UniProtKB/Swiss-Prot annotation:
Keyword vocabulary terms for this entry: ATP-binding, Cytoplasm, Glutamine amidotransferase, Hydrolase, Ligase, Nucleotide-binding, Purine biosynthesis
UniProt source species: Lactobacillus acidophilus (strain ATCC 700396 / NCK56 / N2 / NCFM)
Name this protein carries in UniProt: Phosphoribosylformylglycinamidine synthase subunit PurQ
InterPro entries listed in its UniProt record: Class_I_gatase-like, PRibForGlyAmidine_synth_PurQ
Pathway: Purine metabolism; IMP biosynthesis via de novo pathway; 5-amino-1-(5-phospho-D-ribosyl)imidazole from N(2)-formyl-N(1)-(5-phospho-D-ribosyl)glycinamide: step 1/2
Annotated Gene3D superfamilies: 3.40.50.880
Length: 223
């Protein structure tokens, strides 16, 4: 399995993501510049967190027009795995690969803390190593993480079991339906605001993010 971690101007979680795959999971992972136009040979592409292009206009709005984006879209269409974390989730919504949008937190403040998530759908390539309805502790760090979508879109997400992660107990940003992460209908594109790559070693405070990476590895072996 070969993984691409896309680096945009302003990305700051690309190293964390690389280390989670390379050091912890021993996967074959490479950094890929936003300037590239091909992702040939890769099985998974990751859009990491950060502040691509300084979050000007809207979060992810400029990154969405980078050279690499058509290749990401092609991977999604081919059924390959696409993961967007934090700013990566915002980019996926700007691309239209995932419905809805991420707006400013209800508090209008940047929130950096560990939150409790409930695994709503463990039947995806990203979550098959979690238990159904499992509660996990994952860090968040964002100012624009409040998930919004029209009621008909929210209803469709719920009916299709596309809500993958949901905030439990405290909703830190005002996301509708307490949504922390969603996938597309096909299940091969996941966007989430929390940072699983920051929860893969005990020395960092916990390993509740590790099953996500193990799930991806398992999906790659079975493909």
């Amino acid at each position: 399995m070969k993984i691409a971690v896309v680096v945009f101007p302003g990305s700051n979680c690309d190293i964390d993501m690389y280390e989670a795959f390379h050091t912890v999971c021993k996967d074959d992972v490479e950094y890929v510049s936003y300037k590239e136009k091909s992702l040939d040979g890769f099985d998974v592409v990751v859009l990491p967190g950060g502040f691509s292009y300084g979050d000007y206009l809207r979060t992810g709005a400029i990154a969405r027009f980078s050279n690499i984006i058509p290749a990401v879209e092609n991977m999604a269409k081919e059924g390959k795995l696409v993961l967007g974390v934090c700013n990566g989730f915002q980019i996926l919504t700007e691309m239209g690969l995932l419905p809805g949008a991420l707006k400013k937190n209800d508090s209008l403040q940047f929130v950096c803390k560990t939150v409790t998530l409930e695994v709503e759908n463990m039947h995806t390539p990203f979550t098959n190593e979690y238990a159904d309805k499992e509660f996990i502790q994952i860090p968040i760090a964002h100012g624009d993480g409040s998930y919004y979508a029209d009621e008909n879109v929210l209803e469709e997400l719920e009916d299709n079991h596309q809500v993958v992660f949901r905030y439990h107990g405290e909703n830190p940003n005002g996301s509708l339906h307490d949504i922390a992460g969603i996938c597309n209908k096909e299940g091969n594109v996941l966007g989430m605001m929390p940072h699983p790559e920051r929860a893969v070693e005990e020395i960092l405070g916990g390993i509740d993010g590790l099953p996500l990476f193990k799930s991806l590895l398992k999906a790659g072996v079975q493909a």
